């Protein structure tokens, strides 16, 4: 076991996400004081969330946070013994919180902890511009999402800025064309483009 990275506490909380929907948060504390936190939306049939949080919290106590595969295996085995569908996203929240705590415990950024020391590419942001399908409540589009990906951006920040420029330009075009600029569940515009 890596010194100081033993999981000494896992706390679960019920929250609401940015849309006011139920979510769960896991917070993991390590022996060396490092912490990690993650929030995941709950599915509709999440069962007894409090019970799932308690069961999954206890199953990883005293495990080595730097052994992500081992922790995930324990979580999956525990979840399958009680019914994975009823775990309501808390399994994912615990797994993510363990990763973040391990990275903090080792004093490195999460991307470096997960990606290793070899130079790699940082993630490229993707942004939904127009929502359709089940996300576009007020339109008849068959596609669920029309997204932009800022390929070639020099940094994540530059990529996000490019996405926002396109988003704002699209909003102006929709307004000029007389379309609504309300947004759907995933943040994309939901104009009726029939």
Please give the residue ranges for each predicted region.
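Conserved phosphate/anionic-ligand binding catalytic regions in large, soluble enzymes, centered on
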Residues: 15-26, 83-103, 124-141, 185-189
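Short glycine/threonine-rich loop-to-helix capping motif typified by GTGT followed
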Residues: 190-194
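Flexible, glycine/charged-enriched surface loops at secondary-structure junctions
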Residues: 65-72, 86, 110-113, 171-188
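Glycine-centered tight beta-turn/hairpin loop motif at sheet-sheet or coil-to-beta transitions
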Residues: 31-33
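Metal- or metallocofactor-binding catalytic centers and their adjacent structured scaffolds
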Residues: 38-108, 160
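Mobile "lid/hinge" segments at catalytic clefts and subdomain interfaces of large enzymes
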Residues: 49, 120-184
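Glycine/threonine-rich beta-strand-loop-alpha-helix active-site module
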Residues: 108-126
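Short, Gly/Pro- and small/polar-rich lid/capping loops
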Residues: 1-22
